[in-house]
UniProtKB/Swiss-Prot annotation:
The lineage of its organism: Eukaryota, Metazoa, Chordata, Craniata, Vertebrata. Mitochondrial intermembrane chaperone that participates in the import and insertion of multi-pass transmembrane proteins into the mitochondrial inner membrane. May also be required for the transfer of beta-barrel precursors from the TOM complex to the sorting and assembly machinery (SAM complex) of the outer membrane. Acts as a chaperone-like protein that protects the hydrophobic precursors from aggregation and guide them through the mitochondrial intermembrane space. This is Mitochondrial import inner membrane translocase subunit Tim9. It comes from Rattus norvegicus (Rat). InterPro entries: Mito_inner_translocase_sub, Tim10-like, Tim10-like_dom_sf. Keywords: Acetylation, Chaperone, Disulfide bond, Membrane, Metal-binding, Mitochondrion, Mitochondrion inner membrane, Protein transport, Translocation, Transport, Zinc. Belongs to the small Tim family.
């Protein structure tokens, strides 16, 4: 059975998600939307927005992978150090 995440942590995670979403929306909007003379979204604005989002998602994925790799290396180093310390001389 999965452990429940405390409500305070759920709220914190949701606030972080909203902050990230708002930052991404603002960044892509400012980069992609330049013309306010029409109500319609232009095809180039759609394409730009899609590329902006894809780039952000790929970047986030790469950062997460590097973060995991770093933690694995740190854990291996700690395990090796603990193994050396635990051996009699």
């Amino acid at each position: 059975m999965a452990a429940q995440i405390p409500e305070s942590d759920q709220i914190k995670q949701f606030k972080e998600f909203l902050g990230t979403y708002n930052k991404l929306t603002e960044t892509c909007f400012l980069d992609c939307v330049k013309d306010f003379t029409t109500r319609e979204v232009k095809p180039e604005e759609v394409t730009c927005s899609e590329h902006c989002l894809q780039k952000y998602l790929k970047m986030t994925q790469r950062i997460s992978m590097r973060f995991q790799e770093y933690h694995i290396q740190q854990n291996e180093a700690l395990a090796a150090k603990a193994g050396l310390l635990g051996q009699p001389r």
